[in-house]
């Protein structure tokens, strides 16, 4: 039944018109960006993957490590684009969702891909020359292979934004409303899983870096399974005597205090010796001074069952960042 309005303006009809304009604008953006995305996928598939296969410059395991599921993702885009061009958004995106697992696989391989690229550029002269030659093609517009490799993960975020907007601006009586709503949900769930994979990879990188900075028997396995939050120098204020600089590494469950090795140490110069581990679940944190945000720095008090730490910094902003990170770590252990 059509709604009729006695006046010249009808709020319901105006709202529908706004939805339709937003829907049309979003659909147009999805189509235009998909064309560009598919073009870039095709450039890599043609000028890198295809030629590398033909020339044998990289062995199949190395090629697979570098590009992962790229060709299958390219195929999924080739399936989707005709539906978008024909205005069959719901049907096209419903079919596209069957390929979302490819993006999970691509994300899980992304760190290995970047590592393989750097290793091969360093040690494989033929591959290095080939990459430079292909990157110089005008079709790439100055983009390097390392800039193009994250493209599918960037596109997944665009998919989420655009498909969610498309679903939100599609009325419940539209024939493709259910298809678009389901596609938006599945794409958002995939984007969240990919984000989680990326966060874990970044954390693993931090843990390897921190573990490499620690030396000595006590340091073995200290970072295994932990979630890194921050690190930096702070001054430890003892009951008597002068404050001593120490390096601190904060994880969600512990605060690690480390002392720098002597610079002239034959084997371990530039590393740190672990001096203490403080459990965040048993920590009570307070600011002794440094609440005002002034230029004079501040002092934090960390109380544990058998010890109390006073940590000082002359940088007020840095101390505030530490305070917020410590607060978050303590809260995460008590929830």
Swiss-Prot record:
<dbReference type="GO" id="GO:0005085">
    <property type="term" value="F:guanyl-nucleotide exchange factor activity"/>
</dbReference>
<dbReference type="InterPro" id="IPR035899">
    <property type="entry name" value="DBL_dom_sf"/>
</dbReference>
<dbReference type="GO" id="GO:0005886">
    <property type="term" value="C:plasma membrane"/>
</dbReference>
<keyword id="KW-1003">Cell membrane</keyword>
<dbReference type="InterPro" id="IPR001849">
    <property type="entry name" value="PH_domain"/>
</dbReference>
<dbReference type="InterPro" id="IPR042987">
    <property type="entry name" value="ARHGEF39"/>
</dbReference>
<keyword id="KW-0344">Guanine-nucleotide releasing factor</keyword>
<feature type="domain" description="PH">
    <location>
        <begin position="227"/>
        <end position="331"/>
    </location>
</feature>
<dbReference type="Pfam" id="PF00169">
    <property type="entry name" value="PH"/>
</dbReference>
<dbReference type="Pfam" id="PF00621">
    <property type="entry name" value="RhoGEF"/>
</dbReference>
<keyword id="KW-0472">Membrane</keyword>
<dbReference type="InterPro" id="IPR000219">
    <property type="entry name" value="DH_dom"/>
</dbReference>
<dbReference type="InterPro" id="IPR011993">
    <property type="entry name" value="PH-like_dom_sf"/>
</dbReference>
<feature type="domain" description="DH">
    <location>
        <begin position="22"/>
        <end position="197"/>
    </location>
</feature>
<comment type="function">
    <text>Promotes cell proliferation.</text>
</comment>
<dbReference type="GO" id="GO:0030335">
    <property type="term" value="P:positive regulation of cell migration"/>
</dbReference>
<protein>
    <recommendedName>
        <fullName>Rho guanine nucleotide exchange factor 39</fullName>
    </recommendedName>
</protein>
């Amino acid at each position: 039944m059509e709604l009729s309005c006695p006046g010249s303006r009808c709020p319901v009809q105006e709202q529908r018109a706004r939805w339709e304009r937003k829907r049309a604008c979003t659909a147009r953006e999805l189509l235009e960006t998909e064309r560009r995305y598919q073009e870039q996928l095709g450039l890599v598939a043609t000028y890198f993957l295809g030629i590398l296969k033909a020339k044998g410059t990289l062995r199949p395991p190395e090629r697979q490590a570098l590009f992962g599921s790229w060709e299958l993702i390219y195929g999924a885009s080739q399936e989707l684009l005709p539906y978008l061009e024909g205005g069959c958004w719901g049907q096209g995106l419903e079919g596209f969702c069957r390929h979302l697992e490819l993006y999970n696989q691509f994300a899980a391989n992304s760190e290995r891909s970047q590592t393989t690229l750097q290793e091969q550029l360093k040690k494989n002269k033929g591959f290095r020359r080939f990459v430079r030659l292909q990157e110089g093609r005008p079709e790439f517009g100055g983009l390097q292979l390392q800039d193009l490799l994250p493209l599918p993960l960037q596109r997944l975020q665009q998919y989420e934004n655009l498909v969610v907007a498309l679903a939100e601006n599609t009325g419940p009586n539209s024939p493709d409303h259910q298809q678009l709503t389901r596609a938006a949900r599945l794409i958002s769930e995939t984007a969240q899983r990919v984000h989680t994979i990326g966060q874990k990879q970044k954390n693993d990188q931090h843990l390897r870096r921190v573990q490499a900075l620690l030396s000595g028997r006590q340091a073995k396995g200290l970072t295994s399974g932990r979630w890194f939050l921050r690190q930096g120098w702070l001054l430890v204020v003892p009951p008597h005597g002068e404050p001593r600089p120490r390096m601190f590494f904060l994880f969600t469950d512990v605060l690690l205090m480390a002392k720098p090795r002597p610079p002239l140490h034959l084997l371990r110069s530039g590393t740190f010796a672990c001096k203490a581990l403080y459990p965040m679940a048993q920590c009570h944190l307070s600011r002794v001074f440094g609440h005002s945000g002034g230029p004079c720095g501040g002092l934090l008090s960390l109380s544990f069952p058998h010890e109390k730490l006073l940590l000082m910094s002359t940088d007020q902003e840095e101390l505030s960042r530490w305070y917020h990170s410590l607060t978050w770590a303590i809260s995460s252990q008590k929830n």
